[in-house]
Amino acid sequence: MAEVKNKKASVATPEKETVVVQKDKAAALVKPQFNAQVDKRMLVEEVHQQAIFDSILSERASRRQGTHQVKNRAAVSGSGKKPWKQKGTGRARHSSRRSPIWVGGGRAFGPQSVKNYSLKVNKKVKQLAFRSALTMLVNDKAVLVEDFKMDKISTKDLSQKLKSLNVDKLRHVILVSENATVFKSSANLKNVTTLKAHSLNVETLVRADVLLVENESMKLLTERVLGSN
């Protein structure tokens, strides 16, 4: 038995090979590198993660409509008459058929439309978050300032333009433009989100794989960031 144990011990176990599973095919693509001329005053030396987190929470909360509402016992239709007398029937006492414990009665503590979901974030914190998110893109060399000159509405032409920049396969392409032709041309491109300069927010910058900005929009962004300091 001792010899058998020695034989088993002498057998070398093969080394396990590490297998890398690529879940997202788009993540395997090499993003192009852009060196955009961005005013250094728009950037920050240190990215503030907490400011980004607070601003995104505030932006998401502001998008909530808050139109949900249910009927409580005061709003539900029905008689307020007492179903039966208080004593003498042997049954439990009840005050109204509109009580929440009755079928068809009102909802107790249900959601009401008067609730306000907005979260206040200071202006300086919002600006710090915006500049931090922009700094992250600039550090990743994912910002390009270029005019998309389009004489007519054409999704094909815009798609070819994006292909020439090697960004057509990226998942989140953010295009900032004030041109209505560019807006309509990009409407059917699923991976392209077109916004105006005043509509660009922190969450959009954080989710972006690449940020394409026209010169006119870049001037507006610069005024927006530096004008509030």
Curated annotation (Swiss-Prot):
**Annotated stretches, region: Disordered:** 62-103
Q: Which UniProt keywords apply?
A: Ribonucleoprotein, Ribosomal protein, RNA-binding, rRNA-binding
Q: GO molecular function of the protein, one example?
A: rRNA binding
Its GO biological process terms?
translation
GO terms for CC? ribonucleoprotein complex; ribosome
Q: Which Pfam families match?
A: Ribosomal_L4
User: In what ranges is there compositional bias, type Basic residues?
Assistant: 82-97
Task: State whether keyword DNA-binding applies.
Answer: no
NCBIfam families, A to Z: rplD_bact
Q: Which family does it belong to?
A: Belongs to the universal ribosomal protein uL4 family.
Task performed by this protein: One of the primary rRNA binding proteins, this protein initially binds near the 5'-end of the 23S rRNA. It is important during the early stages of 50S assembly. It makes multiple contacts with different domains of the 23S rRNA in the assembled 50S subunit and ribosome.
Assembly: Part of the 50S ribosomal subunit.
Q: Which PANTHER family match?
A: 50S RIBOSOMAL PROTEIN L4, LARGE RIBOSOMAL SUBUNIT PROTEIN UL4M
- The protein depicted here goes by the name Large ribosomal subunit protein uL4
Please give the organism. Answer: Mycoplasmopsis synoviae (strain 53) (Mycoplasma synoviae)
